[in-house]
């Protein structure tokens, strides 16, 4: 299972991107922001945007956790 290694919204906020600014500037939509808040995986396009805004690689924000089924 993939999960976030960092608090995405907090890191974006530290860079000056509040959830309001993300929506207003049409960088990330409300539905994707809600997914991130709920710990759900955002879309590939949203992950691309996050990596661009944070100047990072996907591996910096995501990690794989093995779950026994």
Predicted region positions:
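Short, basic-rich loop-to-helix N-cap that marks the start of a DNA-contacting helix
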Residues: 39-52
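A short, Lys/Arg-rich alpha-helix, primarily the initiator
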Residues: 1-21
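Alpha-helical residues within the helix-turn-helix
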Residues: 13, 24, 52
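Short, charged recognition helix plus adjacent turn
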Residues: 2-3, 11, 27, 35, ...
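Short alpha-helical DNA-recognition segment
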Residues: 16-35
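Residues that mark the N-terminal boundary/hinge immediately upstream of a DNA-recognition element
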Residues: 18, 43-46, 57
